Amino acid sequence: MAARAGPRAALAGAAAVALLSAALVLYELPPGAVLQRAFSLHKAHSVEDMENTLQLVRNIIPPLTTKKHKGQDGRIGVVGGCQEYTGAPYFAAISAHKVGADLSHVFCTREAAPVIKSYSPELIVHPVLDSPSAVHDVEEWLPRLHALVVGPGLGRDNILLENVKGILEASKARDIPVIIDADGLWLIAQHPALIQSYQKAVLTPNHVEFNRLSEAVLSHQVDGSDHHEAVRRLSQALGNVTVVQKGERDVISDGKQVLECTQEGSSRRCGGQGDLLSGTLGVLVHWALHAAPEKTNGSSPLLLAALGACSLTRQCSLQAFQKHGRSTTTTDMIAEIGPAFSKLFET
């Protein structure tokens, strides 16, 4: 027995170190019972509590096995990419692929397709988003997709936005999870009913996008001094849609629970990090929703997926910054996905 205890103790110690920088905080909840029901926590902010929390994220990650066939671990679609913006959909799709999705699709405009194809032969690129038949063309692929990431590199062209509205409606009709970022959030601010009360939607606004959504949905900007209450209120107003407010500390809420991810990141704020997050989140949402109930221990699959995606994105940023400093780019961060994933979830 003594020989077996050593490796387990070392594993717990390594996990505790990672968890000290990836703390989870819950707000606006009755103490005790809800904490235990949601995350099996027994003593707030202890190392054991944090280990339990990250273990729930680890639990949703499917094991690698030779018994699976291509596609089972995730087929993710990214809707976005236009003449001006080709990097964002690539960042989202390749991040999903590197996290563990078997296939990544990009549905973009005809002009953007050759550019995105040139970035990587590993992505499946569909030049349909500006077509008159765009909704039908994407809808044909929906039965083969596990999650849709909407918004990276989308732009605000009226034709594209109208097509995306139809794609969102078709995705909801098929009960497909949707992660909405960037100009997808601008569209939601104009038409909140598109995702109202859709429980498989996750919004990932930054500070500016969050304020825009709050003004559209709540008719005013919420009190910025209480980020946790602000995110909770926006989620509730949207019908308990999961909201991830990106910031110095990422705040996540489904209107019932509020989580705070304090995983250490870096001070570098280059464009594209949100695309890494949204692509990662697409995969983790798929895994979380398909995990056995005992794996999540009764907690919200989407909250766990969001916490995992935020933690991984921050860890990638930290590792890239340690190597490249001020010159760090999102490409550098994407190169860290494998090592960061292993450090957080497989050690």
Curated annotation (Swiss-Prot):
Binding positions (ATP): 246-250, 265-274
GO molecular function: ATP binding; ATP-dependent NAD(P)H-hydrate dehydratase activity
Disulfide bridge positions per record: none
Modified residues (Phosphotyrosine): 85
UniProt key word Plastid: no
Keywords: Acetylation, ATP-binding, Lyase, Mitochondrion, NAD, NADP, Nucleotide-binding, Phosphoprotein, Transit peptide
Highest taxon, organism lineage: Eukaryota
Domain YjeF C-terminal: 53-344
GO cellular component terms, A-Z: mitochondrion
A biological-process GO annotation: nicotinamide nucleotide metabolic process
Residue stretch of the organelle transit peptide: 1-46
Main location per the UniProt record: mitochondrion
Cofactor(s) needed by this chain: Mg(2+)
Entry's localization field: Mitochondrion
UniProt xrefs under CDD domains: YXKO-related
EC number(s) recorded for this UniProt protein: 4.2.1.93
Catalytic activity: (6S)-NADHX + ATP = ADP + phosphate + NADH + H(+); (6S)-NADPHX + ATP = ADP + phosphate + NADPH + H(+)
Family: Belongs to the NnrD/CARKD family.
Function of the molecule: Catalyzes the dehydration of the S-form of NAD(P)HX at the expense of ATP, which is converted to ADP. Together with NAD(P)HX epimerase, which catalyzes the epimerization of the S- and R-forms, the enzyme allows the repair of both epimers of NAD(P)HX, a damaged form of NAD(P)H that is a result of enzymatic or heat-dependent hydration.
Entry protein name: ATP-dependent (S)-NAD(P)H-hydrate dehydratase
